[in-house]
Amino acid sequence: MSKVYDWFQERLEIQAIADDITSKYVPPHVNIFYCLGGITLTCFLVQVATGFAMTFYYRPTVTEAFASVQYIMTDVNFGWLIRSTHRWSASMMVLMMILHVFRVYLTGGFKKPRELTWVVGVILAVITVSFGVTGYSLPWDQVGYWAVKIVTGVPEAIPVIGSNVVELLRGSVSVGQSTLTRFYSLHTFVLPLLSAVFMLVHFLLIRKQGISGPL
């Protein structure tokens, strides 16, 4: 084992990287509430794992989506557990994200010089809510269908461009296959990619600036 370590150490100097990661100063005022962001990240990783597992069985068509979800719940080995964990961790992720935002706001973590960290965090919050909106429609049951119809119909109140925005979201004038395809693409590819990018930026900023001090 030491030979393997020495091989990597000689080429990558991993000990220096490990020392840098483990030697970061942690302020004495930090408590359990400062773990809310990390819990949110953990929920996101659970979402990725369980969501990836379900893509092997889910079919994003208006005629097969609901049946494929039922198949996951009843016929796939531990499918009920995978989907239930996905749903529970989604709710937990939103809750932890909200509590994290409140903690940062109440402790003044958004103030100079951490404005960019706050802005990136707000973007991540919007992405998290978008996960919920897009994922809610994927079973394509009555609840999901009407939720999509209502959510995508909201921009219609915008003057001049409202109808164009609605058509852009739905993929057509009415809710249908194009809408489900777009929401599935957003939920499984676009939003996870954006989350990964902004999370990386968020962590690098925190790493650079450190944790904010007490009030």
Curated annotation (Swiss-Prot):
Membrane topology: Multi-pass membrane protein
Cofactor binding mode and count: Binds 2 heme b groups non-covalently with two histidine residues as axial ligands.
Alphabetical list of SUPFAM superfamilies matching this protein: Transmembrane di-heme cytochromes
GO BP term (any one): respiratory electron transport chain
Keyword Coiled coil attached: no
Pfam families: Cytochrome_B
PROSITE patterns: CYTB_NTER (PS51002)
Subcellular location: Plastid, Cyanelle thylakoid membrane
GO cellular component: cyanelle thylakoid membrane
This protein's UniProt keywords: Cyanelle, Electron transport, Heme, Iron, Membrane, Metal-binding, Photosynthesis, Plastid, Thylakoid, Transmembrane, Transmembrane helix, Transport
Cofactor(s) the protein requires to work: heme b; heme c
A GO MF label: metal ion binding
Residues bound to heme b 1: H100, H202
Family note: Belongs to the cytochrome b family. PetB subfamily.
Xref: HAMAP family: Cytb6_f_cytb6
Assembly and oligomerization: The 4 large subunits of the cytochrome b6-f complex are cytochrome b6, subunit IV (17 kDa polypeptide, PetD), cytochrome f and the Rieske protein, while the 4 small subunits are PetG, PetL, PetM and PetN. The complex functions as a dimer.
Note: Heme 1 (or BH or b566) is high-potential and absorbs at about 566 nm, and heme 2 (or BL or b562) is low-potential and absorbs at about 562 nm.
Its job: Component of the cytochrome b6-f complex, which mediates electron transfer between photosystem II (PSII) and photosystem I (PSI), cyclic electron flow around PSI, and state transitions.
Designated name of the protein: Cytochrome b6
Species classification: Eukaryota, Glaucocystophyceae, Cyanophoraceae, Cyanophora
Record gene name: petB
